[in-house]
């Protein structure tokens, strides 16, 4: 082999090993779950909203992302608002939405 080819061999080997390491790390990360948000979504809440304006309600229980119960209402206008889960009006809304869903 020529001296130039011999000097390039370690660099080529190093580049190939680095590429192999990156490919292996990428495959391992591909199977990991993806978490969208690691914080609470509701920074401000409403005490209530009229039931006729609500399309659906999503209740998120406390977990690693947030230590509070979150109630997110999707309105018929397409907007989403956060509701105070401890407000009496919100508790009634959740009960009505659950009863409506179980009746269907």
From Swiss-Prot:
Places the protein is found: Secreted
GO (cellular component) term, any one: extracellular space
Assigned keywords, A-Z: Cytokine, Disulfide bond, Growth factor, Inflammatory response, Secreted, Signal
Pfam families: IL8 (PF00048)
Domain of life of the native organism: Eukaryota
Principal place of residence: secreted
GO biological processes: immune response; inflammatory response
Molecular-function GO terms, alphabetical: chemokine activity; growth factor activity
Record's keyword annotation contains Disulfide bond: yes
Disulphide bonds in the chain: 40-66, 42-82
Residues annotated as signal peptide: 1-31
Role, per record: Plays a role in monocyte adhesion to the endothelium.
Family: Belongs to the intercrine alpha (chemokine CxC) family.
PANTHER family, per database record: GROWTH-REGULATED ALPHA PROTEIN, SMALL INDUCIBLE CYTOKINE A
Name of protein: Growth-regulated protein homolog
Species of the source: Oryctolagus cuniculus
